[in-house]
Regions:
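Conserved alpha-helix/loop element of class I SAM-dependent methyltransferases that forms part
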Residues: 20-39
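Conserved class I S-adenosyl-L-methionine
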Residues: 38-47
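Conserved SAM/SAH-binding beta-strand->alpha-helix loop
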Residues: 71
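Conserved SAM-binding strand-loop segment of SAM-dependent methyltransferases
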Residues: 86-97
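A short acidic, Gly/Pro-enriched loop at the edge of an enzyme's catalytic core
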Residues: 98-109
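A short SAM/SAH-binding and catalytic strip from SAM-dependent methyltransferases
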Residues: 107-120
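A short glycine-rich, Lys/Arg-flanked "PGG" loop and its adjoining helix->strand segment in the class I
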Residues: 122-137
Length: 175
C-alpha cells in the first residue's frame, strides 16, 4: 500500500477534531440507524474510529465490529482508543478494497463519509454486497464531498435499493 498524503492529512484533521472538540456527535448519528446488541458491523473506511467505538459499545460483547481502513495509523488509533475505553469486540482490517470476510456475514455496513475517497466504487460496492446478510443493510452518510444526488446515482447502478433516509444517512438493502 503506497503512502497517500491526502489520507495522512485527513487522519491528522480527524485526530485534531476529536481532541479540540469541534462539534461532531457520532453517537447521535449512530442512534439514527437500527443497531442492536449482538450484531456484526463493518465500519468501512473507519478512520480513527469515531463511529467504530460507539457502535462497538452498542452491539456489546456478543456483537462484533470490523474496522476497515487503508491507513495503518488510523487502525492503530482505533486499537488504542478501544483499549483505553475497555472495548474488546473490535477487529481491525488493513485494506483498500477486499474485506476478507465470509459471504453474508455482516448485519450492518457503515460507509460514512468515505464513498468519495473510494477509487474503484464498483468493486467495493460488489464486495460490500457479498458480505452483507440478506436482511442486513448498507448505511451511507453523505457529506459536502459527495451530495445525496450523486450517491443515489452511483447506487442506482448496484444491486442495492434505498429503503430509508434519516437526515444525512441513506440506508440501502439488497434488491
Amino acid at each position: 500500500m503506497k503512502f497517500n498524503v491526502k489520507s495522512r492529512l485527513e487522519y491528522i484533521f480527524l485526530r485534531l477534531r476529536d481532541r479540540i472538540g469541534i462539534p461532531f456527535k457520532p453517537v447521535e448519528e449512530i442512534k439514527k440507524i437500527d443497531i442492536k446488541q449482538g450484531q456484526v458491523i463493518l465500519d468501512y473506511g473507519c478512520g480513527i474510529g469515531s463511529y467504530t467505538i460507539p457502535v462497538a459499545k452498542l452491539v456489546g460483547e456478543l456483537g462484533k465490529v470490523y474496522a476497515l481502513d487503508k491507513q495503518p495509523l488510523a487502525l492503530k488509533n482505533v486499537e488504542e482508543r478501544a483499549e483505553k475505553e475497555g472495548v474488546h469486540n473490535i477487529h481491525t482490517i488493513l485494506s483498500d478494497g477486499y474485506t476478507g470476510l465470509p459471504d453474508e456475514s455482516v448485519d450492518v455496513i457503515l460507509l460514512y463519509g468515505v464513498l468519495p475517497e473510494i477509487e474503484d466504487k464498483d468493486f467495493v460496492l460488489r464486495e460490500l454486497y457479498r458480505v452483507l446478510k440478506p436482511d442486513g443493510y448498507l448505511s451511507i452518510r453523505y457529506c459536502f464531498r459527495m451530495k445525496k444526488d450523486r450517491i443515489l446515482e452511483i447506487m442506482d447502478t448496484t444491486k442495492f435499493s434505498l429503503v430509508e433516509q434519516k437526515d444525512h444517512i441513506l440506508n440501502f438493502k439488497k434488491k
